[in-house]
Curated annotation (Swiss-Prot):
InterPro entries from the UniProt entry: eIF3f, EIF3F/CSN6-like_C, JAMM/MPN+_dom, MPN
GO molecular function, one term: translation initiation factor activity
Domain MPN: 8-138
Listed GO biological process terms: antibacterial innate immune response; defense response to Gram-negative bacterium; formation of cytoplasmic translation initiation complex; positive regulation of Notch signaling pathway; positive regulation of peptidoglycan recognition protein signaling pathway
Transmembrane segments: none
Annotated protein name in UniProt: Eukaryotic translation initiation factor 3 subunit F-1
Taxonomic source organism: Drosophila persimilis (Fruit fly)
PANTHER family: EUKARYOTIC TRANSLATION INITIATION FACTOR 3 SUBUNIT F, EUKARYOTIC TRANSLATION INITIATION FACTOR 3 SUBUNIT F-RELATED
């Protein structure tokens, strides 16, 4: 498959690690680089992890601690053997003169490595994200070169990552600037109530869209129609009594788990007080 047909999907944890590495950089470092880890399947490069590689850039050369990069990769392989080197990342919104030199190293580590740039300067009020592949140029028997060509990049996340991002969004504006922003964990029933309320609002939005299409107030979108059809087909067919019975059973199980967890918490607190109780 041609490198130009690749699509890059980046998980949020990668961006957090890039920003953390940029904040911890040396004072004389203007740019931070690192290795991208993930998998490649059917033309999709899914980036799930990364780490920073210490380096120094001079006018005519680049010095990178390659032994450190190999050690970090071996450690990551012990934790998750499914993650392989898929490319490299750098802070900034441009491809520099040293990028081709760094890319040559990663071209020896994997096929068609991707180059991801993250604009940590937040130009335009947001973090710019771009991905590139390096295409060889030249004529037979003549000079050759390379050119970084942009390819599509998008953000993706697993369900736990999505939940974590939503929790992080709740910390915005919950406390003054001089105090740490914290959000206490929600109880299980409160989470169910919040999810049900959000689901109800989304259903109302879908119903409004369908009514507007039927009334010819909105131009129908075939892609949205196919997604709604797939959504309807994914709903299991059951009677109202069956749904009520299944829902009540799940609620009973949830209440039982909450009760047992509270009992365990109380027992641990009691055991802690008995442990530190002074003996006669």
């Amino acid at each position: 498959m041609s490198a130009l047909n690749l699509t890059v999907r980046v998980h949020p944890v990668v961006l957090f690690q890039v920003v953390d590495a940029f904040e911890r950089r040396n004072a004389e470092s203007h740019r931070v680089i690192g290795t991208l880890l993930g998998s490649v399947e059917k033309g999709v490069v899914e980036v799930t992890n990364c780490f920073c590689v210490p380096h120094k850039e001079h006018d005519d050369q680049v010095e990178a601690e390659l032994s450190y990069a190999l050690d970090m990769y071996d450690l990551n392989r012990k934790v998750n053997s499914n993650e392989a080197v898929v490319g490299w990342w750098a802070t900034g919104n441009d491809v520099t003169n040293h990028s081709s030199v760094i890319h040559e190293y990663y071209a020896r580590e994997c096929n068609n490595p991707v180059h991801l740039t993250v604009d940590t300067s937040l130009q335009g009020g947001r973090m710019g994200l771009r991905s590139y592949v390096c295409i060889q140029l030249g004529v037979p028997g003549g000079k050759t070169g390379c050119m970084f060509t942009p390819i599509p990049v998008e953000l993706t996340s697993y369900e736990p990552e999505t939940f974590g991002l939503k929790l992080l969004q709740k910390t915005v504006g919950v406390a003054p600037a001089n105090r740490p922003k914290t959000v206490p964990p929600m109880l299980d029933l409160a989470q169910i109530s919040e999810a049900s309320t959000k689901l109800q609002s989304l259903l109302d939005l879908i119903l409004k869209y369908v009514d507007d299409v039927i009334a010819h107030k909105v131009t129908p979108d075939n892609a949205v129609g196919r997604q709604l059809l797939d959504l309807i087909h994914s709903v299991p067919h059951m009677s109202h009594e069956q749904f009520t019975q299944m829902f009540n059973a799940n609620v009973r199980n949830l209440l039982m788990v909450i009760t047992l967890s509270q009992l365990i918490k109380t027992q641990l607190q009691l055991n802690e007080k008995l442990t530190f109780l002074p003996t006669a």
